[in-house]
Amino acid sequence: NEICTALGENYAIIIKLHPFCKEKYEIDENLRNRIIDLSEADELNDLLFVTDLLITDYSSVVFEASLLDIPMLFYAFDLDEYIENRDFYYDFKEFIPGKTVATQDELITAVRNKDFESEKVENFKHKFFDDIDGKSSQRVADKIISLLNLEN
């Protein structure tokens, strides 16, 4: 609520909580036209097509978002605690394809200034994905046909 209010009328926020989160997010009555809780939506990837900026914490959605060239902010207010309790496969700050913020004020400032460190997205994509050329479906179809021809 505070973030939406601080950013002003030009922003709408879609909330999609992790499926294991059972807490219901309380949205102020006067912000319900700008904060939309789609936590019950089945398919996260569909939401990415209407996403101008992804604000996340430690979610693997960054892989899908990077393929769509979506700028990202990482709201890691509890990073030290998260590392202590769960940790990561990679060094978090080296791994993420965007800017890390630790407070709501830092998040608001980054959004207002469009300071997302978006240049990290391209490097991230090429580190984790091969053949990013829009022809993956064709390669899969060719492989299936090839395998079917081997059986005949």
Language model: regions and residue ranges:
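Catalytic binding pocket for nucleotide-activated donors in carbohydrate/polymer assembly enzymes
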Residues: 26-33, 60-128
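Acidic donor-binding loop of glycosyltransferase active sites
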Residues: 49-59
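C-terminal alpha-helical cap of glycosyltransferases
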Residues: 133-152
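Hydrophobic/aromatic beta-strand patches that form the interior of the parallel beta-sheet core
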Residues: 14, 36, 53-55, 73, ...
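Short acidic alpha-helix that forms the nucleotide-activated donor recognition element
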Residues: 42-50
